[in-house]
């Protein structure tokens, strides 16, 4: 008899808790979410939050056709169609300016300093100030540097592993100048 009472009380408690939970799940909840802002509204907010300066123009916020296509591909989850991707990559390849003297390599110490430097193209910079590459933000280049990113592939021993033939040097130059020549929607910025 006592066990029956305990079972009935337990079952009643479970039923009460279940009813309360169902009420929470189906009852009024928080107010409906606000309508998501449009792309135009987002761009207007971004532009209003930046100052135009000689070293950092507001036009930098205007997307190129490549950026527009890649933004749309990212938003929809649909990759670029082959024809558009090929057109965008061909335009990127055409933008590359190779060294007129044919020298792809320079002072490696100066190159290391540029790779380490993340400064540049900020509104507070003097017009024409040299910008750094900030390569270490995404790549490992030297094993001695422990503060490096891993978004991009390691570049440790890049030249040693690949050699310094004309095709490799030209490929590397192109990758740095405008990496979109090889991958339209890559995250690496253009440095040319």
Give names to the regions the model predicted:
Residues 2-13:
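Bacterial N-terminal signal peptides that target proteins for export
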Residues 13, 87-90, 150-151:
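A short alpha-helix capping/helix-coil boundary motif
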Residues 101, 127-129, 190-192:
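A glycine-rich, coil/turn loop motif that links secondary-structure elements
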Residues 4, 18-121, 175:
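Post-cleavage N-terminal segment of exported redox proteins
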Residues 123-134:
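Local sequence-structure signature of Cys/Sec-based thiol-disulfide redox active-site neighborhoods
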Residues 15-23, 143-146:
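Residue-level signal for alpha-helical transmembrane segments in multi-pass membrane proteins
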Residues 36-37, 41-42, 49-53, 57, ...:
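Extracytoplasmic electron-transfer domains, predominantly the class I c-type cytochrome c fold
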